[in-house]
From Swiss-Prot:
Protein name: Serine--tRNA ligase
GO cellular component: cytoplasm
Enzyme class: ligase
Native source species: Rhizorhabdus wittichii (strain DSM 6014 / CCUG 31198 / JCM 15750 / NBRC 105917 / EY 4224 / RW1)
BP GO terms, sorted: selenocysteine biosynthetic process; seryl-tRNA aminoacylation
Predominant location category: cytoplasm
Subunit structure: Homodimer. The tRNA molecule binds across the dimer.
Involved pathway(s): Aminoacyl-tRNA biosynthesis; selenocysteinyl-tRNA(Sec) biosynthesis; L-seryl-tRNA(Sec) from L-serine and tRNA(Sec): step 1/1
Amino acid sequence: MHDIRLIREDPAAFDAAIARRGAESASSRLLALDERRRAIATELQAAQTRRNEASKAIGQAKAQKDEATASALMAEVAALKERMPALEAEGAEVEAALDAALAAIPNLPAADVPDGADEQDNAEQHRWGTPPAFAFEAREHADFAGPLGLDFEAAAAISGARFAVLKGGIARLQRALGAFMLDRQTAAGFTEVIPPLLVRDEAVFGTGQLPKFAEDLFRTTDGRWLIPTAEVSLTNLVREQIVAEAELPMKMTALTPCFRSEAGAAGRDTRGLIRQHQFEKVELVAITTPEQSDAVHEAMTKAAEAILEALGLPYRRVLLCTGDMGFTARKTFDLEVWLPGQGCYREISSVSNCGDFQARRMNARYRPAGESKGTRFVHTLNGSGLAVGRTLVAVLENYQQADGSVTIPEALVPYMGGIAELRPA
């Protein structure tokens, strides 16, 4: 959500910023609604004031036996009482239209975000690790993980496409990955949370998935939404809250199932675990002040990178361009892991600084130190630390052996009960 006051102050700058996101000029439409809203509010306030004055004057006129004046004032009060509900209704309608228009516009990009249309225009920041060299032709995980316990056919029979059943060693490996990630992130200062998986409209609106991306979500018959990411539940913990500056930054992590319809991804990544309707992810969320925001963003990104490095998985960090960023983000770093079977880097984490965009939608504020009354909107940040299923894919492909077995990364062996290798059944 955007601050209409800032748009009033510099409409040209606002239009220039959203143009970088590929959005059409909006300031004229927004300011017209804002002007009408304020005019109605002014007229309503004047009507209320005049009604009170006239009501008081009626008593005075009657006390003076001036029935003509009293009658005229009574007629005026009656007209005002009839007019005011119409003004209130019109004001509510205009305000709703303004709020809806503001809610449909993406966040403004930070100054250092590169302009661009899509992922081809993203800016690589750095790389870590060297892609493994195999003495055999590397395969995609879907081509060799079946004998390890990965079963797409059984899942399809139960649930349809884009689901998987994991059994035996590969199921244990996924569980180990999630536990390993949680342990690392809590050691990095994130508080573990077990949040709800079903949320209300207000929660999904607050983090920006509604109303624009409803088709990408699953909704229950009673009107709740399955979370597409724990970002929704964690970030909404501060909705309608005022926290003390001393409590910031608040850093939270959660391992949850996530659910996405992938309506906009038809035909993409139809094989394997890369794009599923149901998957597990360790989410990182931070609530902080504007002054700390950039530093927290960097620290969160490094916390995600540390998982990849501990697992020995080659990756690169890219700064997303304006055309590839998510709706709520003002700046996003993607971490892309090397997948030998595909011969390319694929996204495994996206860490975003949303500024006060989500906070305005949620009315999430903090009270600066030393102030007893004033409040400011918090900044919210979120990222994957990491996507468990995609990390499983990366481990399978980077540690695959010619005989179809998979070596367990050293850091995971304790989480596997000492098992150092997965072998085909």
